[in-house]
Amino acid sequence: MRVAITGANGFVGRNLIALLLADIPAGEIRALVRTPRQAAAELPTADLDIRVADVTRPESLRGVFDGCDAVVHTVAIPTERHGSFAAVNVGGTRNVVAEAERAGVRRIVHLSAIGASATSPYPFLRSKGEGEDAVTAARIPSVVFRPSVLFGPGDDFFPRLGFALHFPIVPVPGDGSARFQPLHVGDLALAIRAALRRDDVLGIHEIGGPDPVTYRELLAETMAGYRKRRPTMNLPVPLMKPAAFLFERVMADPPVTVAQLDLLAVDNTPHPNAMDQVFGIRPRAFRDGGLSYLSAG
C-alpha cells in the first residue's frame, strides 16, 4: 500500500509515520510537507517519498497523490489568523479531496475534531465541520476521526496549557467542570492504521482516551507533568477574554485565543468512544504520569 500523508512532519504525521514504517517500506510513504529543510530534521527517516506541497495552493498538489492507494489528511490549524480557518481547514481540505479524486485514490482518512459541524457556533469547529462535509461528499470511501485532545511527546495542547503556570494564580475558564477525554497520539496512530486496512470502519468516529477528566483535572495533570504547583481561581470566560485578546495582538503564537477560551469551557468527550468499540484498541491512561514528558522537555 502506498500512503500519502499531509502534514507529515506535524505531531500526528510524525507519530503515524513511525508506526507505519513497521509495515510499509519508507519509499511507499509519501510525506507531504511545506518546508522540506525543516521537515528533514523532524521526520523519522529521510528515506520517505518526500513531496513539497501546500494544501491552500491547489497547483502545488497537482500529481502528489498519483499512484497512492490512500491519503491521510492531518493538516489543520487551531488558531485563526486573517481568515486562515477558511483557507486551511476548509479550502485546504477541499483541495486535498479534489486532487485525491483526480488521482484515483481509494481511501481518505481525515482528522477532524469532536463537535465538528458546519452549523457550530464556534469558528474552529465550524471550519472542521465544513472540511468534514467535503470529505464525506467525495466519491472516495472515507474514515473521519473526531478525537478529543491529544497528548504525547511533542504535543501542542498541554504546553499551551502550561503557559498559565507562569502566573502565581492559574485562571480556570468557567467552573472548570468541562470534560475532556485525552487520547495518546500513539493510540490515534493505531486507529488510523486500522482505518487504512479495514473496510468495515468507514464513516465518522468520535474517539478519546479511557476516562473523562475535567478541565481542573487537566490542569492538575499538567502541573504534575511540569512538577509545579499553583493555586487556581475560577473566572467567568468573558472576564478572561481581554487577556486572550491581548495575547493575540502582541504574540505571534499566542497560548490561547478568544475563540479557544470558549472551547475550554465546553465538553469534549466522544459519544460513543469508537477506540475500543469499533477498533478494538484499549487506549493508554492519561492520569498518573501521562504527561511526565513535559518536565523532560
Whereabouts are the PLM-identified features?
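N-terminal Rossmann NAD(P)H-binding glycine-rich loop of SDR-like oxidoreductase domains
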Residues: 1-23
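SDR active-site strand-loop-helix element
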Residues: 6, 32, 74-75, 108-114, ...
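Residues forming the Rossmann-fold NAD(P)(H) cofactor-binding site
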Residues: 11-14, 90, 129
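NAD(P)H-binding glycine-rich loop region in Rossmannoid oxidoreductase-like domains
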Residues: 37, 46-95, 99-102, 114-117
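Conserved beta-loop-beta element that borders a ligand/cofactor-binding pocket
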Residues: 112, 133-156, 163
